[in-house]
Amino acid sequence: NTGDKKIVYYNSSPALDLLGCISDNSLEHNLPGVDFSIDTDFIWEEPNDQFLHHDLVKLPSGNYMGIVATSQLGPIPIGPWTSEYQEFGFTANGFSNEFPWVGDKIVEWDKDTKEVIWSWSVFDHFSMEDFDAIGGTWLYNSTSNNGSFKYDWTHVNALIFSEQESAVYISTRHLSRITKISYPSGEVIWNMGRDMPSGEVDLGNNL
């Protein structure tokens, strides 16, 4: 883009609303989601209470839905990385909840009040038995950043809302998984992708 507004484009609505984020390093959450015009005038901006990333969509109701980061403590799984974590004082026994896992939450904001009126968290619907064991995400240099430890567990990077099916689709990069979610119940209809220890993948695990 051009001009003094550092806008990142994600997608557009059927009504040709342009949706994305604006880069603003003065903010704690430096990529607030925005609905903007072709002239880069802001039509709507999410409240920036949480870190939004990768996708923002406008629903047929006029409300907005996006992907935000959420976290909770979880175990460090047993693996080739175990001894390295233990050297830094972690138990790293595969079951002690001692390490920050960063997951994702799908959030719907009211278009007028910007209040969260619906949400869905991976921590409520995915098993922490499932993680990327082959992509290097548990290697120590992937989880440590200037002494700030965190594990990028799910990394949801795409969101689609289907009014016809009353469903939300998400793509979860680090689990190699696509999930269909019933809206508004939040029930997982199916998971498609790599087979993992929980057995929660229903189809596509032989692709």
Regions found by a protein language model. Give the residues of each.
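Secretory-pathway ectodomains
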Residues: 1-207
